[in-house]
């Protein structure tokens, strides 16, 4: 299996982004350790607690520059249409929502995206920011 499963989260100590495997410490407390593939046998590893609200999973997808796309990222397509990436349990997949649709009461903003869409638009997708470092980008106007 070639699927990379990893997470990111902000350190509770210095707000640095940490990447790797997610470990549950106890109820509502999580830590990130280096990806299991990067751990050498016989070496000690660091475990760093992360803020629960900032944890996001790697989607397995990359943008046009080869940058990893994570849950919580804000992406744009051709410099337009800012969208948020989020895993939706009901659909059992990563979905997108137009930021402009998030506060509309009359619609459910999250849309499934076919695998072909990611392939067709890969050269047009750019990670603009994420909702944790730039919450102002998703505020209602």
Describe the function of each predicted region.
Residues 1-141:
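Secondary-structure transition motif
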